């Protein structure tokens, strides 16, 4: 199994590297006049939420810096696959970009049998925009007070967990927990985050992994109880809440959400570099960091090669979990 994962890892890295290295003289000519028309950033979800907020703050600031229109277009549907596929099929000229979350870049290829795009062959990395922490929560009135207690309870009782849909980080986080702790959890998928969180709040569902900015207000007023942060270290926003690693004795546990900007494959390298340079600078602006803080997001702004490595690692990690835990779309 190790050799097959290594082989897959190598193929992903090679494809990403080839995509990034497809550079020639025309690329520099494109860079000199880029942008000369409206840039579209496609968000594969409905307006509102972290992905939309990230795209809009980047679009607004790019437009200001370049004195050229940059618009956000929301194309929801099929767990984000419709919007991302539309960009994968667009002209590779730098004028159509995609806001791509971890699920669409590194998870869905292992979950969907007929995915309408290949994130490695059909898309080129630009930069990772931000990372968002997830937190494991139960209802405030639940008699489960700790992750250790939840794990013990799951050995004799049916524990349910809600998600915004199959393949979401809430789904994978719960399955990673179940797989690591040797327990069974019952998946109850919803059509979106709001209803998934609502039924944990009212006690219909036992638990969920929620993005920190969505859960924090309810944790603060006692309507939710935080059992563990799904990141390698504790969150500065909830410093008293242990990590899942600490609370559940699960070494290496991590289920972090991230959002990246990607372009169609074969987009000139000089344009990719120009976009990355500008966006990395934008992510350091105080006003932009304030917007990200409000979303519970930590800015990144890494290079295309570094983003390719992140996609590479997460693809290998999540595909292994999906295979080992026999995770399927429901």
Mark where each language-model region is.
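Short, low-complexity disordered leader/linker segments with a strong preference
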Residues: 1-36, 330
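N-terminal (or domain-start) structured segment
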Residues: 28-121, 157-160, 166, 182-207, ...
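A ligand-binding cleft/hinge motif common to bilobed small-molecule-binding domains
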Residues: 104-114, 176-180, 207-241
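An extracytoplasmic/periplasmic, membrane-proximal ligand-sensing/linker region
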Residues: 30, 36-38, 179-180, 220-221, ...
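Hinge/capping helix and adjacent helix->loop/strand transition within the periplasmic-binding protein
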Residues: 89-95, 102, 110-195, 244-249, ...
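Stable alpha-helical elements in mature extracytoplasmic
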Residues: 50, 54, 58, 83, ...
